[in-house]
Amino acid sequence: ETLSSARFRCKPNSEWRTQIPLFPQEVEACVLS
């Protein structure tokens, strides 16, 4: 999975924690997006 697709899956910062576990770099991308 790419970081781009991870960003789409993350949604708002308040919701990404409830999504399917991400790789550390993907989690960081979510927080920054």
UniProtKB/Swiss-Prot annotation:
<comment type="function">
    <text>This enzyme is part of the viral RNA-dependent RNA polymerase complex.</text>
</comment>
<comment type="subunit">
    <text>The polymerase complex is composed of four chains, the three other proteins of the complex (alpha, gamma, and delta chains) are supplied by the host cell.</text>
</comment>
<keyword id="KW-0548">Nucleotidyltransferase</keyword>
<dbReference type="GO" id="GO:0003968">
    <property type="term" value="F:RNA-directed RNA polymerase activity"/>
</dbReference>
<keyword id="KW-0808">Transferase</keyword>
<protein>
    <recommendedName>
        <fullName>RNA-directed RNA polymerase beta chain</fullName>
        <ecNumber>2.7.7.48</ecNumber>
    </recommendedName>
</protein>
<keyword id="KW-0696">RNA-directed RNA polymerase</keyword>
